[in-house]
Amino acid sequence: MNVPAQPPTWSLHPQLGADTSNIGDLPLARVLLMNDANYPWLVLVPRRPDIVEVIDLDDEDQEILWREIALLARVLKDVTQCDKLNIAAIGNVPQLHVHVVARRRGDAAWPRPVWGAGPPRPYEAPERDRLVAAIRREIAFG
């Protein structure tokens, strides 16, 4: 008997899960909050299996991802009143993820990039919960 192969399933890379809190799901991407209170920092992870680079997504998913990045960037800017947004698909975790980081003049790394600027400062639960609630008020997560 020939049993059809099961399609691959998506799961969050353990390193991304260890460093973040789940905010919710958009049509394509899971939205995570990086556990670093030095910077309001979101991570979007497309919920597609075996995707490492943006170019691994089909054209439609690439367009959806950029719309979701823009949506989250606008919300993060409004919620944090930041001076600048940093948006990047950077790092070596072998699962596509896009960082959206709110920056303020005088933050712990300003004006340098946040990567490698110093140790993360984990969120206290009330501070994290306030930021997550503010973001959820602006976006209808699935």
Language-model-derived ranges and their functions:
Residues 1-142:
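HIT superfamily nucleotide-processing domains
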